[in-house]
Protein backbone atom coordinates (compact mmCIF):
# COMPACT_ATOMS: atom_id res chain seq x y z
CA UNK A 1 0.00 0.00 0.00
CA UNK A 2 1.01 3.62 -0.43
CA UNK A 3 0.32 6.86 1.36
CA UNK A 4 -0.70 7.72 4.91
CA UNK A 5 -3.77 9.22 6.60
CA UNK A 6 -2.23 9.76 10.05
CA UNK A 7 -0.68 13.24 9.55
CA UNK A 8 1.90 13.07 12.34
CA UNK A 9 2.97 16.66 12.92
CA UNK A 10 6.64 15.93 12.11
CA UNK A 11 6.09 13.85 8.95
CA UNK A 12 5.97 14.91 5.31
CA UNK A 13 4.76 11.54 3.92
CA UNK A 14 1.06 12.50 3.54
CA UNK A 15 2.15 15.51 1.47
CA UNK A 16 4.57 13.57 -0.75
CA UNK A 17 2.82 10.17 -1.01
CA UNK A 18 -0.82 11.18 -0.63
CA UNK A 19 -3.61 9.37 1.18
CA UNK A 20 -3.63 5.62 1.87
CA UNK A 21 -4.21 3.37 -1.15
CA UNK A 22 -4.31 -0.40 -0.76
CA UNK A 23 -3.88 -3.09 -3.41
CA UNK A 24 -6.17 -6.09 -3.65
CA UNK A 25 -5.11 -9.28 -1.92
CA UNK A 26 -5.21 -11.03 -5.30
CA UNK A 27 -2.69 -8.63 -6.86
CA UNK A 28 -0.30 -9.03 -3.91
CA UNK A 29 -0.62 -12.82 -4.00
CA UNK A 30 0.09 -12.87 -7.75
CA UNK A 31 3.24 -10.77 -7.28
CA UNK A 32 4.47 -12.97 -4.42
CA UNK A 33 3.95 -16.13 -6.49
CA UNK A 34 6.06 -14.63 -9.28
CA UNK A 35 8.79 -13.76 -6.76
CA UNK A 36 8.76 -17.32 -5.39
CA UNK A 37 9.06 -18.69 -8.93
CA UNK A 38 12.18 -16.53 -9.33
CA UNK A 39 13.73 -18.07 -6.21
CA UNK A 40 12.90 -15.51 -3.52
CA UNK A 41 12.49 -17.11 -0.09
CA UNK A 42 11.62 -14.04 2.00
CA UNK A 43 8.82 -11.57 1.29
CA UNK A 44 8.49 -8.10 2.83
CA UNK A 45 5.12 -6.34 2.70
CA UNK A 46 5.75 -2.60 2.44
CA UNK A 47 3.69 0.45 3.23
CA UNK A 48 4.02 3.80 4.95
CA UNK A 49 1.40 2.47 7.39
CA UNK A 50 1.29 -1.11 6.25
CA UNK A 51 -0.99 -2.50 8.97
CA UNK A 52 -3.72 0.02 8.23
CA UNK A 53 -4.20 -1.94 4.99
CA UNK A 54 -7.83 -2.25 3.96
CA UNK A 55 -9.19 -3.28 0.58
CA UNK A 56 -12.89 -3.98 0.05
CA UNK A 57 -13.24 -4.98 3.70
CA UNK A 58 -10.11 -7.15 3.83
CA UNK A 59 -7.73 -6.47 6.73
CA UNK A 60 -3.96 -6.66 7.00
CA UNK A 61 -4.30 -9.85 9.06
CA UNK A 62 -6.20 -11.44 6.16
CA UNK A 63 -3.51 -10.29 3.71
CA UNK A 64 -0.83 -11.91 5.88
CA UNK A 65 -2.76 -15.18 5.95
CA UNK A 66 -3.15 -15.17 2.17
CA UNK A 67 0.58 -14.61 1.61
CA UNK A 68 1.46 -17.18 4.27
CA UNK A 69 -0.57 -19.81 2.38
CA UNK A 70 1.56 -19.49 -0.76
CA UNK A 71 3.76 -22.54 -1.29
CA UNK A 72 7.46 -21.69 -1.20
CA UNK A 73 7.21 -18.58 0.98
CA UNK A 74 9.65 -19.33 3.80
CA UNK A 75 9.62 -15.97 5.56
CA UNK A 76 7.30 -12.97 5.69
CA UNK A 77 8.14 -9.59 7.21
CA UNK A 78 6.34 -6.26 7.01
CA UNK A 79 7.19 -2.62 7.56
CA UNK A 80 6.34 -0.05 8.73
CA UNK A 81 3.32 -0.43 11.01
CA UNK A 82 1.59 2.15 13.20
CA UNK A 83 1.00 1.26 16.89
CA UNK A 84 -2.64 2.32 16.66
CA UNK A 85 -3.30 -0.45 14.12
CA UNK A 86 -1.51 -3.28 15.96
CA UNK A 87 -4.24 -5.50 17.39
CA UNK A 88 -4.72 -8.92 18.96
CA UNK A 89 -6.13 -10.39 15.73
CA UNK A 90 -2.93 -9.50 13.88
CA UNK A 91 -0.71 -10.86 16.66
CA UNK A 92 -2.62 -14.15 16.80
CA UNK A 93 -2.30 -14.57 13.03
CA UNK A 94 1.46 -13.96 13.28
CA UNK A 95 1.80 -16.45 16.13
CA UNK A 96 -0.16 -19.10 14.23
CA UNK A 97 2.07 -19.23 11.13
CA UNK A 98 5.68 -20.45 11.17
CA UNK A 99 6.62 -18.54 8.04
CA UNK A 100 5.57 -15.16 9.47
CA UNK A 101 8.65 -13.79 11.23
CA UNK A 102 8.64 -13.40 14.99
CA UNK A 103 9.52 -9.72 14.68
CA UNK A 104 7.65 -6.41 14.79
CA UNK A 105 8.90 -2.90 14.15
CA UNK A 106 6.94 -0.90 16.73
CA UNK A 107 7.58 2.86 16.36
CA UNK A 108 7.29 4.59 19.74
CA UNK A 109 8.59 8.08 18.76
CA UNK A 110 8.23 9.36 22.36
CA UNK A 111 7.32 8.08 25.81
CA UNK A 112 5.65 11.33 26.88
CA UNK A 113 1.90 11.70 26.47
CA UNK A 114 2.29 15.45 26.01
CA UNK A 115 4.83 15.01 23.21
CA UNK A 116 2.84 12.19 21.60
CA UNK A 117 -0.15 14.53 21.50
CA UNK A 118 1.93 17.30 19.90
CA UNK A 119 3.19 14.73 17.40
CA UNK A 120 -0.42 13.70 16.64
CA UNK A 121 0.50 10.06 17.18
CA UNK A 122 -3.10 9.13 18.29
CA UNK A 123 -2.00 6.77 21.10
CA UNK A 124 -0.75 7.15 24.67
CA UNK A 125 2.30 5.73 26.41
CA UNK A 126 -0.08 3.49 28.40
CA UNK A 127 -1.60 2.02 25.22
CA UNK A 128 1.85 1.56 23.71
CA UNK A 129 3.12 -0.26 26.80
CA UNK A 130 -0.01 -2.43 26.90
CA UNK A 131 0.38 -3.50 23.26
CA UNK A 132 4.11 -4.18 23.73
CA UNK A 133 3.16 -6.47 26.63
CA UNK A 134 0.51 -8.19 24.46
CA UNK A 135 3.11 -8.77 21.74
CA UNK A 136 5.46 -10.47 24.19
CA UNK A 137 2.54 -12.45 25.69
CA UNK A 138 1.19 -13.76 22.36
CA UNK A 139 4.56 -14.00 20.58
CA UNK A 140 7.21 -15.02 23.14
CA UNK A 141 10.76 -13.94 22.23
CA UNK A 142 9.42 -11.61 19.53
CA UNK A 143 12.08 -9.23 18.29
CA UNK A 144 10.99 -5.61 18.80
CA UNK A 145 12.55 -2.59 17.14
CA UNK A 146 11.38 0.99 17.28
CA UNK A 147 11.81 4.58 16.07
CA UNK A 148 12.38 7.40 18.57
CA UNK A 149 12.76 11.14 18.03
CA UNK A 150 14.66 13.21 20.61
CA UNK A 151 14.46 16.97 20.92
CA UNK A 152 10.98 17.36 19.47
CA UNK A 153 9.86 21.01 19.77
CA UNK A 154 8.89 21.78 23.36
CA UNK A 155 10.34 18.55 24.80
CA UNK A 156 11.40 19.16 28.41
CA UNK A 157 14.01 17.15 30.26
CA UNK A 158 11.21 15.52 32.27
CA UNK A 159 9.44 14.46 29.07
CA UNK A 160 12.70 13.06 27.70
CA UNK A 161 13.05 11.05 30.95
CA UNK A 162 9.56 9.64 30.33
CA UNK A 163 10.81 8.29 27.01
CA UNK A 164 13.80 6.63 28.70
CA UNK A 165 11.43 5.19 31.30
CA UNK A 166 9.20 3.62 28.64
CA UNK A 167 12.29 2.21 26.92
CA UNK A 168 13.23 0.56 30.23
CA UNK A 169 9.74 -0.94 30.53
CA UNK A 170 9.59 -2.32 26.98
CA UNK A 171 13.27 -3.13 26.29
CA UNK A 172 13.59 -3.04 22.50
CA UNK A 173 16.04 -5.31 20.69
CA UNK A 174 17.07 -2.36 18.55
CA UNK A 175 16.08 1.25 17.97
CA UNK A 176 16.41 3.79 15.19
CA UNK A 177 16.98 7.02 17.09
CA UNK A 178 16.96 10.47 15.55
CA UNK A 179 17.42 14.10 16.50
CA UNK A 180 14.32 16.03 15.46
CA UNK A 181 14.76 18.02 12.26
CA UNK A 182 11.98 20.16 10.74
CA UNK A 183 10.32 19.10 7.49
CA UNK A 184 8.69 21.63 5.15
CA UNK A 185 4.88 21.89 5.20
CA UNK A 186 4.61 20.00 8.50
CA UNK A 187 2.87 21.41 11.56
CA UNK A 188 5.90 20.80 13.79
CA UNK A 189 8.01 23.07 11.59
CA UNK A 190 5.82 25.94 12.79
CA UNK A 191 6.27 25.20 16.51
CA UNK A 192 8.24 27.95 18.19
CA UNK A 193 9.82 25.94 21.04
CA UNK A 194 12.67 24.46 19.00
CA UNK A 195 15.36 22.59 20.97
CA UNK A 196 19.03 23.50 20.56
CA UNK A 197 21.33 21.10 18.69
CA UNK A 198 23.54 20.74 21.78
CA UNK A 199 20.60 19.54 23.90
CA UNK A 200 19.43 17.20 21.13
CA UNK A 201 22.89 15.64 20.87
CA UNK A 202 23.19 15.26 24.63
CA UNK A 203 19.83 13.50 24.85
CA UNK A 204 20.53 11.29 21.84
CA UNK A 205 23.89 10.19 23.27
CA UNK A 206 22.25 9.24 26.58
CA UNK A 207 19.51 7.33 24.76
CA UNK A 208 22.04 5.40 22.67
CA UNK A 209 23.88 4.26 25.81
CA UNK A 210 20.61 2.91 27.22
CA UNK A 211 19.63 1.18 23.98
CA UNK A 212 23.05 -0.47 23.62
CA UNK A 213 22.62 -1.89 27.12
CA UNK A 214 19.19 -3.30 26.28
CA UNK A 215 20.44 -4.77 22.99
CA UNK A 216 23.37 -6.45 24.75
CA UNK A 217 21.13 -7.84 27.51
CA UNK A 218 18.70 -9.36 25.00
CA UNK A 219 21.48 -10.70 22.75
CA UNK A 220 23.15 -12.42 25.72
CA UNK A 221 19.93 -14.33 26.37
CA UNK A 222 20.28 -15.89 22.91
CA UNK A 223 23.73 -17.33 23.58
CA UNK A 224 23.51 -21.13 23.49
CA UNK A 225 20.20 -21.20 21.60
CA UNK A 226 19.61 -22.65 18.15
CA UNK A 227 18.37 -20.17 15.53
CA UNK A 228 17.39 -20.49 11.89
CA UNK A 229 19.36 -17.93 9.89
CA UNK A 230 18.62 -16.91 6.32
CA UNK A 231 21.91 -15.93 4.68
CA UNK A 232 21.53 -12.64 2.82
CA UNK A 233 24.96 -11.34 1.83
CA UNK A 234 28.71 -11.41 2.33
CA UNK A 235 29.84 -9.94 5.63
CA UNK A 236 31.14 -6.38 5.35
CA UNK A 237 34.02 -7.29 7.66
CA UNK A 238 35.38 -10.29 5.77
CA UNK A 239 34.84 -12.09 2.47
CA UNK A 240 35.29 -15.34 4.43
CA UNK A 241 32.10 -14.72 6.39
CA UNK A 242 28.43 -14.43 5.57
CA UNK A 243 25.71 -12.31 7.14
CA UNK A 244 22.12 -13.34 7.72
CA UNK A 245 19.15 -12.68 9.97
CA UNK A 246 17.31 -14.78 12.49
CA UNK A 247 13.54 -15.09 12.50
CA UNK A 248 13.45 -12.29 15.10
CA UNK A 249 15.67 -10.02 12.97
CA UNK A 250 19.04 -10.29 14.73
CA UNK A 251 21.99 -10.13 12.37
CA UNK A 252 24.37 -13.09 12.61
CA UNK A 253 27.86 -13.44 11.09
CA UNK A 254 28.80 -16.97 9.99
Show where each model-derived region lies.
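Conserved SAM/AdoMet-binding glycine-rich loop
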Residues: 37-157, 168
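Internal alpha/beta loop-helix hairpins
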Residues: 176-181
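Canonical Radical SAM [4Fe-4S] cluster-binding loop centered on the CxxxCxxC motif
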Residues: 1-26
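Conserved, mostly hydrophobic/aromatic
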Residues: 8, 28, 45, 78, ...
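Alpha-helix N-cap and loop-to-helix initiation/capping positions
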Residues: 20-27, 58-59, 120-127, 155-159, ...
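Radical SAM enzyme [4Fe-4S]-AdoMet core and its adjacent flexible, acidic
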Residues: 53-73, 119-122, 182-213
Amino acid sequence: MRGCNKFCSFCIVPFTRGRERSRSIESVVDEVKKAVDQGFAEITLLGQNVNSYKYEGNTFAELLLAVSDIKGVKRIRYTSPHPQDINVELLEVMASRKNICNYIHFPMQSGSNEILKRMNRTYTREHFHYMASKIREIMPNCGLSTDIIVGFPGETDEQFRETLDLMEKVKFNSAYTFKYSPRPYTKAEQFTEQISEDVKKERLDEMLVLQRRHTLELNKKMVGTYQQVLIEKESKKSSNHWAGRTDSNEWVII
